[in-house]
């Protein structure tokens, strides 16, 4: 399930975090199967000539824009037939500790551990309000998650909303990929919910050095953040936060309020 809109970004972000692509040039075309006239994305320099025989072309009144056909560039290996969201899960055990950490470690092309960026507690404390102010659909409905990508100085680069928080993050990362901001060096990913293992995995795959959430992280999310060298912040509310990993990126010297930032 996803909220319609920014679907090309969603596809790019999902394929990035599943280690299928690392640049926009790895995708030749992406178009809505049931709308041949509109909704086409063309790759950087490859003509748009998809094989529409695989797509059901609907009448105008039937177009739902719910199926996006993505064609990888020539020479790109196709994902396995069992590829699905969360490549580190299995039906028998779900997300499995050490195996999951190892899978992310082997797949990521942009490990964030070496990113020297630092962020002040005051900058971090301002992010939730900035994210909320940019959530237009949430303000109208109260029903969507959001993710936003910020610079280390607190500039909001992009925000995306979706009924699924994983989709919101994928849309943000797809935007970053299409705008040549992957790896997202020096950036902070802010999410409106909790920090799950899956969201930490997505941040790591995109080379993002800091992930902040308004709620708690899972224990496996903390383990992955420590293993990958990512700064993980939870319960970022008002003037308080918990830092679960990567405390060296919090510039406490720049703040007079040491109580802003408590190690977890």
Residue ranges, per PLM feature:
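Cysteine/selenocysteine-centered motifs that mediate thiol-based redox chemistry or coordinate metal-sulfur cofactors
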Residues: 33, 62-71, 183-218
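Structural signal for hydrophobic packing residues in well-ordered secondary-structure cores
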Residues: 19, 100, 108, 135, ...
